[in-house]
């Protein structure tokens, strides 16, 4: 079986405009050492906005 290592961590994605945390995802710390920024739909703003990784 594959080993469970600590390379993947669970992160929250927050909207940069309203600050609401809408999405939860995983990232690999080795491949993405910096904070992730993705364009996602924000239900509060009712449009696609940039979401940034929060701790």
From Swiss-Prot:
The keyword DNA-binding does not apply. Coiled coil: none annotated. The keyword Ligase does not apply. GO terms for biological process: translation. Keywords: Ribonucleoprotein, Ribosomal protein. InterPro entries: Ribosomal_bL33 (IPR001705), Ribosomal_bL33_CS (IPR018264), Ribosomal_bL33_sf (IPR038584), Ribosomal_zn-bd (IPR011332). It comes from the Bacteria. PROSITE patterns: RIBOSOMAL_L33. Transmembrane segments: none annotated. Pfam families: Ribosomal_L33 (PF00471). One of its GO terms (cellular component) is cytoplasm. SUPFAM superfamilies: Zn-binding ribosomal proteins (SSF57829). One of its GO terms (molecular function) is structural constituent of ribosome. Belongs to the bacterial ribosomal protein bL33 family. This is Large ribosomal subunit protein bL33. It comes from Dehalococcoides mccartyi (strain ATCC BAA-2100 / JCM 16839 / KCTC 5957 / BAV1). The gene is rpmG.
């Amino acid at each position: 079986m594959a080993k469970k290592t600590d390379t993947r961590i669970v992160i929250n994605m927050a909207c940069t405009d309203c600050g609401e945390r809408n999405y939860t995802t995983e990232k690999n710390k080795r491949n993405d050492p910096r904070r992730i920024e993705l364009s996602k739909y924000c239900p509060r703003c009712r449009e696609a906005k940039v979401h940034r990784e929060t701790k």
